[in-house]
A protein has these predicted regions:
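Helix-to-loop junction immediately C-terminal to a conserved catalytic motif
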Residues: 43
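Conserved ABC ATPase signature
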Residues: 118-122, 126
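P-loop NTP-binding/switch modules centered on Walker-like glycine-rich loops
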Residues: 148, 152, 156-235
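Charged, flexible cofactor/metal-binding loops and thiol motifs
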Residues: 3, 205-270
Length: 270
């Protein structure tokens, strides 16, 4: 809940989830459902809130933001940007920092000479690789990726996703991967949580969720995934009604006003 001028507004409701060591946990849902708010709260980027976040101190979580064009300082060279987390970690030896930066550039698939470039000289995919490297130089074991490929060209997305998976295997990382693109989530995630109006309505392994979804909202989301074969047909599930305001969601189950299986008790209990 966040405190506003008109009082306390609940944005995230009774969310409880576990990201297991070495897995990629996806969080999906339509815009405004609370995905980014949840993850920024985990990182402590929202100060004016109530609630509790419990986390292993050794994880040192870091975030990879959606926009690689706005998350890097345009006035600094890439080497300085990548050295910043090392300075924050107290590594004072300049030569050691530069060597660590060079090694990280190689790890994210870039030449060490990129350290002398500025963000404007890099493509979107290259900038996102730098963002990932910056997070890793903080010695993070939990990376929260907020729509990390949505701003990239389609041809570059697979390269960045494959890099993230390779780094996960190499460094034993854990990811929380936020996306509205269910095809991307299916490609990279191990488990998937579905959010609707600040609540997680379903969480399951990727295989189980995509093959046998339980919640009607999840079924509707999956029915909207495009099928590349024009000969194949999929029945679209159209959800009736408008999305309620996240600041004033319905009582009980937040989905009950749009649910085809609604019962009288749904307005009172979850």
């Amino acid at each position: 809940a966040f405190w506003k001028k008109k009082g306390k507004k609940h944005v995230i409701h009774d969310v409880s989830m576990t990201a297991y060591d070495g897995e990629i946990l996806g969080i999906v849902g339509e815009s405004g459902c609370g995905k980014s708010t949840l993850c920024k709260t985990i990182l402590g980027l929202h100060n004016n809130y109530t609630g509790t976040v419990k986390m292993d101190d050794n994880l040192r979580p870091q975030m990879v933001f959606q926009g690689p064009f706005s998350s890097l300082n345009p006035a600094r060279k890439i080497g300085w940007i990548l050295e910043e987390p090392l300075r924050l970690r107290g590594i004072t030896d300049r030569d050691k920092r530069r060597q660590m930066v060079a090694d990280m550039l190689v790890d994210v698939g870039l030449d060490p000479s990129f350290a002398d470039r500025r963000p404007r000289e890099l493509s979107g995919g290259q900038r996102q690789r730098i963002s990932i490297g910056t997070a890793l130089l903080m010695d993070s074991r939990l990376i929260i990726a907020d729509e990390p490929v949505s701003a990239l060209d389609v041809s570059v997305r697979a390269q960045v996703l494959n890099l993230m998976r390779e780094l996960k295997e190499k460094l034993n990382l854990t990811y929380i991967f936020i996306s509205h693109d269910l095809s991307v989530v299916h490609h990279i995630c191990d488990r998937v949580a579905v959010m609707y109006l600040g609540r997680i309505v379903e969480i399951a392994s990727k295989q189980q969720l995509y093959s046998n979804p339980v919640h009607p909202y999840t079924k509707a989301l999956l029915s909207a995934i495009p099928i590349p074969d024009p000969e194949l047909k999929r029945e679209r599930i159209i959800i009736q009604g408008d999305v309620p305001s996240p600041a004033n969601p319905p009582s009980g189950c937040h989905f009950h006003k749009r649910c085809p299986y609604v019962r009288p008790e749904c307005s009172d209990v979850i």
